[in-house]
Amino acid sequence: MPNTARWAVTLTLTATAVCGPLAGASLATPNAAASGLYAPSALVLTTGHGQSAATATPERAVTLNCAPTASGTHPAAVSACAELRATGGDFDALSARSDAMCTRQYDPVVVTVEGVWQGKRVAYERTFANECVKNSYGTTVFTF
């Protein structure tokens, strides 16, 4: 009987030593996956000359992905994402730079934004008086 008890204890300790780390890793996997979840923020920005998006032909388009990290074809993706985060994704809250000096020439430029910002659909359109005025708004968001 003492040998049987000794074997039982030895097998239990061996099984715990071998299987214990495996059980811990499998229990940690759901927490690791949960911390990697995020709301998507992926946008397509276009620009073209005209009064509205319906009449303007898109001349340039860029992509802007802000989650989990800033990326895309936007030339200043990191700073554009930072500006949008600061306004909570509100494009109307982007203000003009105070140091911009633009002429009063009227050559309308329309910018459109389509996509998803922090999990919510976005459809935005804004017409600027000219290219200089467009580039002065939002510092880098509309500069592409």
UniProtKB/Swiss-Prot annotation:
GO terms under cellular component: extracellular region
Pfam families according to UniProt: SSI
Signal sequence, renumbered to the chain: 1-34
Subcellular location: Secreted
Keywords carried by this UniProt record: Disulfide bond, Protease inhibitor, Secreted, Serine protease inhibitor, Signal
Subunit structure: Homodimer.
Annotated protein name in UniProt: Probable subtilase-type protease inhibitor
Source species of the chain: Streptomyces avermitilis (strain ATCC 31267 / DSM 46492 / JCM 5070 / NBRC 14893 / NCIMB 12804 / NRRL 8165 / MA-4680)
Lineage: Bacteria, Bacillati, Actinomycetota, Actinomycetes, Kitasatosporales
Name of the coding gene: sti1
